[in-house]
Amino acid sequence: MALNPEDLGSGFRHSKVSMFINEQMAKHDKGPDFYLENLSLSWEEVEDKFKVILEDSEVSNEAREACAWGTLALGVRFAHRQGCLQGHGVQWLQDLSSLHKMSALSLSPDLKQLIHQQEMAQKEVALQLQMAQAKLEEVQRERDLLRLKILQAELRALPNAVRPAVAIPPAVVRRGGIRTQWSSTKENLAEWMAAATGRPNERANMSDTALSGTITSPEEVLEDPNGSFMKLLGVMKCKNYPLKRQRLDLRPKKASMCSFSQSLNLRSTVSSEPFIVQLPASFTYSYESPFPAIPTTSQLPTTERQPHVYPYSMASDISHLSDMRIHRGDHQELPKDKRFSAFRRPGDWDCPWCKAVNFSRRENCFHCGKGIWLQNP
């Protein structure tokens, strides 16, 4: 019997089917032999051999039928074997997939731990960077403070000989407390001139060249009471610094005398000569005078000039002038009959609160900032 019914690899599940195929192959001796010889071959090779038998005319029909049943049994056997192989392959793939899943599940905690460690490291680095930036800012602030202290120490270390002095009239010198305020006035004037030129490191040289021989101390003024106040301060050639709301035609074309006699805080009778200061040629910063211009005696055509913003810090300049007791607010200490009426124009008004003189075109007081409209309820 060529086909064993108990053989599970034959591909037949029922024994009757196996027995019937064996009977059909047994009708000719070549049938069982064809089945047993080709068990180890592939289906392509078996098909090629059966084709040769069919083409051979010497083979009888019974032999052909027996070989055909053997070929059928071999085909079923090959199909069953191929199915088993595919089933084993699928099972292997399933096992491999489950193995990969188990590996992924086992590696997931490790991956999470690594991600957490990386995030912690990034946060630590960011914190260190922030701390470094904070330390850098603190060091920069300390550096700036040290520079400021060094600059202040250098300014304090300058000798008194290079600090400028301002001469005032004997009548002002005789006022109470003027000698105690004179040292601060000299230092403020020197710092003002140094800041205006933009060269604070050259304050000593500028003070020597600008004020040597032209500005004297109050003691020298007292020793020579007959001397002129103009001669002590010298003559300054103005470089046509622009004045706020000043008429263009009223500006002198040549070097003029800059008068500060209206804003001097003089409680006693002073000379009618103007307050004149001589500055060096290097003193070229743009400064706008806060005092009104002196009108000339000749009638010139009036042309209004548009107001403009101060190009320099007027707050610091006025503060220095106030330290030197050169401020418009000091006019309130003078009697009305002793004010210089030559500096008033038709329409100028006095502030009812601070008594400062303002131009007719101003609506608010330049000194206290209150409006003229507050006078009328």
UniProtKB/Swiss-Prot annotation:
The residue stretches assigned to a coiled coil in this entry are 122-156
- UniProt cross-references to InterPro entries, sorted A to Z: TEX13A-D_N, TEX13A/C/D_Znf, Znf_RanBP2, Znf_RanBP2_sf
Alphabetized GO MF terms: zinc ion binding
Write out the entry's keywords from A to Z: Coiled coil, Leucine-rich repeat, Metal-binding, RNA-binding, Transcription, Transcription regulation, Zinc, Zinc-finger
Can you tell me which residues bind Zn(2+)?
351, 354, 365, 368
> Zn fingers (RanBP2-type): where?
345-369
Q: List residue spans for each LRR repeat.
A: 142-165
Pfam hit, one: TEX13
Summarize the record's disruption phenotype note.
Mice are fertile with no visible testis phenotype. Mature sperm show a decrease in rapid motility, which includes a decrease in path velocity, track seed, and rapid progression, as well as a decrease in overall sperm concentration. Decrease in mRNA levels of ribosomal components and increase in structural components of the sperm head and tail.
Question: Which protein family is named in the record?
Answer: Belongs to the TEX13 family.
- Summary of the function given for this chain in its UniProt record: Binds to ssRNA containing the consensus sequence 5'-AGGUAA-3'. Plays a role in transcriptional repression. Required for rapid sperm motility and timely degradation of mRNA via its interaction with CNOT1.
**Name this polypeptide is given:** Testis-expressed protein 13A
* UniProt organism field: Mus musculus
| Lineage, uppermost ranks | Eukaryota, Metazoa, Chordata, Craniata, Vertebrata
The record's gene field reads: Tex13a
